Curated annotation (Swiss-Prot):
Cofactor binding remark: Binds 1 pyruvoyl group covalently per subunit.
GO MF entry, a single one: phosphatidylserine decarboxylase activity
Site (Cleavage (non-hydrolytic)): residue numbering on this chain: 384-385
Organism encoding this protein: Bos taurus
Active-site residues annotated for this sequence: 198 (charge relay system), 274 (charge relay system), 385 (charge relay system), 385 (schiff-base intermediate with substrate)
Major location category of this protein: mitochondrion
Name of the protein in question: Phosphatidylserine decarboxylase proenzyme, mitochondrial
PANTHER family linked: PHOSPHATIDYLSERINE DECARBOXYLASE, PHOSPHATIDYLSERINE DECARBOXYLASE PROENZYME, MITOCHONDRIAL
TM helices/strands, residue ranges: 68-86
Top enzyme class: lyase
NCBIfam families in alphabetical order: PS_decarb (TIGR00163)
Localization of this protein: Mitochondrion inner membrane; Lipid droplet
Gene giving rise to this polypeptide: PISD
Assigned GO CC terms: lipid droplet; mitochondrial inner membrane; mitochondrion
Posttranslational modification: Is synthesized initially as an inactive proenzyme. Formation of the active enzyme involves a self-maturation process in which the active site pyruvoyl group is generated from an internal serine residue via an autocatalytic post-translational modification. Two non-identical subunits are generated from the proenzyme in this reaction, and the pyruvate is formed at the N-terminus of the alpha chain, which is derived from the carboxyl end of the proenzyme.
């Protein structure tokens, strides 16, 4: 502007302590002709250029010089020493801007995958803590605000509840396990298999190549999910041969096929599950395991997620042969309850990875097992989770479903 002289700003001088509002550049790039040094020495030859302060940009800039000096020191470490710092470095890798940890690639460091990082989270411990929190009795004046927030967040329809008064539920656990009005979920009597719970259909169809789809394009092994066949299951299995597949060991009648259906229960859904058909439960197998989230996004991300998580497999038979219902645990769903199984205890503090516990309902006094009628109460979760049905049926069995559709307990899954 006229009348005003412009004076060049003096070049900033480096100081001893790194300043969070200045960023470094390599001094060697200004044409001094010197060769680039290696290791931590290359991070000490930095010039300073100005960067807008926090007041101008509204963003906080970290002391990058000190950070990069530290990364230079790490890049000179041996692989064993660097391996001890792998987990905290991986966390920084996913939080810092792209390329910030690039110097560590000189010694062969690679970040831990997101899946492995997520599996390292103590989900079982968090779920046990959540379970204890659910049992804490809320003051009478606090119940309506807490439950109303949950209802608004997850879209719960309290008009279907047998007791609509929010002050009736003493703690979160009672609220999650609320009963429905009898007319809220009529059971379809025209179809042979109904939905055991409210939820979302993730996948369904025939079991092919001994694999089951948890979501579209992501499969898991049928044998890993149900566990190996054992004589203690008291099921009418055909005799196994060395070359027989696991699927053929489950199909008891010639000409039948094996089918599956996966139902995801969201946190706002009705948390109890019921018998999907008339059948007899003869065996229970409990797999202790992780308690990772089972929402559809996570199911697409982690292969064989249902095989990693804790689950309770109920097996038996119905009029067409083999039938099984599996309740899969998830984060904050450490408690899976089966009403007629008092010996079942889930989310124990200690367990052996890959182990399972068998229990037979066939005894000398009861040689048939536990008979279940279609629609009868079977069990419950503390929060949302997943139900997996695997059953044998004739080839003309047809599902009346679409992938991704919402379904409610009592509605038809399929029929002959």
């Amino acid at each position: 502007m006229p009348g005003k002289s412009t004076r060049p700003l003096p070049a900033p001088r480096p100081c001893c302590a790194p300043c969070p509002f200045w960023s470094p550049r390599l001094a060697g790039m200004q044409g001094t002709g010197s060769t680039r040094s290696t290791g931590s020495e290359s991070w000490r030859s930095w010039a300073w250029t100005s960067r807008p302060s926090l007041l101008v940009t509204g963003r906080l800039h970290f002391p990058q010089l000190a950070l990069r000096r530290r990364l230079g020191q790490l890049s000179c470490m041996s692989k064993p020493a660097l391996k001890l710092r792998s987990w905290p470095l991986t966390v920084l890798y996913y939080l810092l801007p792209l390329g910030a940890l690039r110097p560590l690639s000189r010694v062969g460091w690679r970040p831990v995958s997101r899946v492995a990082l997520y599996k390292s989270v103590p989900t079982r411990l968090l779920s046990r803590a959540w379970g204890r929190l659910n049992q804490v009795e809320l003051p009478h004046w606090l119940r309506r605000p807490v439950y109303s927030l949950y209802i608004w967040t997850f879209g719960v329809n309290m008009k279907e509840a047998a007791v609509e008064d929010l002050h009736h539920y003493r703690n979160l656990s009672e609220f999650f396990r609320r009963k429905l009005k009898p007319q809220a979920r009529p059971v379809c009597g025209l179809h042979s298999v109904i939905s055991p719970s409210d939820g979302k259909i993730l996948n369904f169809g025939q079991v092919k190549n001994c694999e089951v789809e948890q979501v579209k394009g992501v499969t898991y092994s049928l044998e890993s999910f149900l566990g190996p066949r054992t004589p203690s299951e008291d099921l009418p299995f055909p005799p196994a041969t060395p070359h027989s597949s696991f699927r053929s060991q489950l199909v008891t009648r010639e000409g039948n096929e094996l089918y599956h259906c996966v139902i995801y229960l969201a946190p706002g859904d009705y948390h109890c599950f019921h018998s999907p058909t008339d059948w007899t439960v003869s065996h229970r197998r409990h797999f202790p395991g992780s308690l990772m989230s089972v929402n559809p996004g996570m199911a697409r991300w982690i292969k064989e997620l249902f095989c990693h998580n804790e689950r309770v497999v109920l097996t038996g038979d119905w009029k067409h042969g083999f039938f099984s219902l599996t309740a899969v645990g998830a984060t904050n769903v450490g408690s899976i309850r089966i009403y007629f199984d008092r010996d079942l205890h889930t989310n124990s503090p200690r367990y052996s990875k890959g182990s399972y516990n068998d229990f037979s309902f066939v005894t000398h006094a009861n040689k048939e097992g536990i008979p279940m009628r279609k629609g009868e109460h079977l069990g419950e979760f503390n929060l949302g989770s997943t139900i997996v049905l695997i059953f044998e049926a004739p080839k003309d069995f047809n599902f009346r479903l679409q992938a991704g559709q919402k379904i409610r307990f009592g509605e038809a899954l399929g029929s002959l």
